[in-house]
């Protein structure tokens, strides 16, 4: 009763369906990149680390994360403790998988919007959502990679507003 609707945007749900197919993909090595050694390797090189994701996870790197945002993220994550906190997000995936697998036993009934980049998670997240919810609205963002708000801002906002307005009725 506390959650009226939920939106998932280009990711995956640990512990749901065949999630390890994504978790173990070689190109997604960063899911397993945490601890002291990775922190030391990235320290002072945050921009280099993030450039890989901003460019390689985009359908077109020229329409990915804008330069001002790149500078902000690199500067912010370069502050003490920030990168370690970011790495912990992925370090928690095994616990998330255990938790989500338990939650998935009771399907969500509220409206769920799933936005997936055509050149990123695509149908995978949509199929996962259908395993955990009974009222799934899904849109594959044509020509977009992982960075939906940067690569397809108008289409993404249109879908979000449409969904929120429909859910509010």
Annotate each language-model stretch with its function:
Residues 2-140, 149, 161-169:
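Flexible "cap/lid" subdomain of the alpha/beta-hydrolase fold that forms the substrate-access gate
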Residues 144-153, 157:
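Catalytic histidine-centered segment of alpha/beta-hydrolase-like enzymes
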């Amino acid at each position: 009763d506390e959650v009226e609707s939920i939106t998932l945007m280009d990711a995956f749900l640990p512990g749901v369906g065949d999630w390890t197919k994504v978790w173990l993909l070689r190109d997604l090595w960063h899911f397993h990149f945490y601890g002291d050694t990775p922190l030391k390797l990235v320290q002072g090189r945050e921009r280099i680390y993030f450039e890989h994701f901003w460019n390689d996870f985009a359908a077109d790197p020229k329409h990915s994360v804008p330069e001002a945002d790149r500078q902000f993220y690199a500067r912010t994550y370069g502050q003490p403790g920030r990168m370690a906190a970011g790495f912990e997000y992925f370090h928690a995936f095994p616990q998330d998988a255990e938790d989500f697998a338990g939650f998935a036993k009771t399907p969500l009934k509220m409206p769920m919007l799933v936005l997936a980049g055509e050149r990123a998670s695509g149908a995978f997240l949509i199929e996962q959502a259908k395993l955990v919810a009974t009222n799934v609205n899904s849109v594959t963002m044509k020509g977009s990679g992982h960075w939906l708000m940067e690569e397809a801002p108008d289409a993404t906002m249109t879908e979000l507003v449409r969904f929120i307005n429909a859910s509010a009725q």
